Amino acid sequence: QEAGCLGTAVTKEIWRERLTHLKKLGCNAIRAAHHTYSEEFLDLCDEMGFYVYEECFDKWKGGLYGRYFDKNWESDVEAMVKRDRNRACIVIWGVGNEVENQGQDSMLAILKQLSDKVRSLDSSRPITYAMNPHFKRESNVDLSKIKDIQQFVDEVSDTEIYDAKERVSRIAKIAEIVDIISCNYQEQWYELIHEQIPNKLILGTEVYEYFCGHYDQMQNFTEQIPSAIPFEYDYCIGSFIWTGYDYLGESMGYPAKGWSGALIRTNNEYRPVAYMLKSIWSEEPVVHFSVMDYSLDDEGVKEHWDSPIYADHWHFPQFRKTLIPYMIASNCDEVHLFLNGKQFFIPRPSECKNGIITGFLPWQPGTVTVVGYQNGKEACRHEVVTPGMAVALAFDQECDHKECVSTVNLGIPEKKQHLLLTVRAVDENGNSCFRESGKVHFAVEGAAKIVGVDNGDICSNEPYQENSVHLYHGCASVMLELYCKPGRVSVHAF
């Protein structure tokens, strides 16, 4: 619902840009969590061909909406369904997320009430409810006195149901009311759920980006990418990663000012895990090399929502001789790996867990090249180079590794709009300098103004509404507002 330095005042072109990045990764569906989204956003989903799971609530009588639920639930459901039932993108209606008293009689009564209302307005689409992995036995807790309903729902208590079969018996009661069994973080029980409830499809309404739980422990660090699971089970129709983009709020504590366990940073920079998902989702040939680098700062991610600390560089000035762990994400038949022209033999992606090749390379400055092959022919490649000293700043929009410039000239739009530009520290050959962290200043000439800066670091305490910001992982971005006036707009980074 927000876009980094813009806050919640997000314009249509910024949503288009973000959806385009997700589409490039192979994403084809959006869960609009957990409220009704703007018409402009859904217009784009119609236009760009995204499936949308739309839901009207998070919690019901608990949480912030609780004071309005009894009075407003019916009008809010009507407003959502009547507004959007003729849209091409809407494929599923959601009526709640991780609510209180899940699977208990009081909850089931409200679930039926909501589901019946939606069906009376639109009988053409399935209805579902996103289940928390926690199920609890009945208690006499007064929910109106719970200050943090999400914490109450999430935390383990003495009423927690640990037995998987007893948990599935609660799920079966929910399944009698909804059309699709929607599970948050419950991939480890899909087989058991399907065995007990074979006539309903399963949807992963929230999944971790890298880890899975264990049958005997809800939260575990099992290395199994949840988004690959729908390709294994024909009764599982998909999964929604929490989340596609970092967002403000729901911080795990200072200095983080938001959620950082996403595929893409607030300034559109991809994390390496994004390429893992692209290798699963996309039919386009993918090969991408990253290193594991524990010298990088902790980004304050909530543990199970995190992924191993990979980074896109080949630069370890602190080492003379050491072995560097790496990861190669690819959907190709085979991958060839070279370090300074010397080949190292590695397994095929199909022979590796999650299709992700891992191993070690000896540190030496130079170039790492990975080449993906399909049907015996080169289909894609990725190179990372040890950079020299940073000598310039280069805008992504102007840098083709032949000419890198710290000024970019823009055309005039037909109407006022926002535009995000990213600049990188580069060496004399145009190679990105990942470890550079100096401060970059932005200036603009012409019919435009700077509305914010963003380096993608959710733990930075630098304000967004400035003209300068430190580089993070060698880059920083500036958000412009362009006016529909004659003339040239020039943007400078220095």
Which ranges hold each PLM region?
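Extended low-complexity, serine/threonine- and proline-enriched intrinsically disordered segments
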Residues: 334-342, 437-452
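Active-site-adjacent substrate/metal-binding segments within catalytic domains
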Residues: 1-117, 123, 127-128
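Short, solvent-exposed loop/turn segments enriched in Ser/Thr/Gly
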Residues: 413-421, 487
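Short aromatic-acidic-glycine turn motif
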Residues: 347-349, 391-395, 441-460
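Short glycine/proline/serine/threonine-rich loop/turn segments at secondary-structure transition edges
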Residues: 484-490
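Substrate-binding clefts and catalytic carboxylate motifs of secreted carbohydrate-active enzymes
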Residues: 23, 91-93, 113-120, 127-144, ...
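Short, hydrophobic beta-strand segments
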Residues: 357-363, 464-484
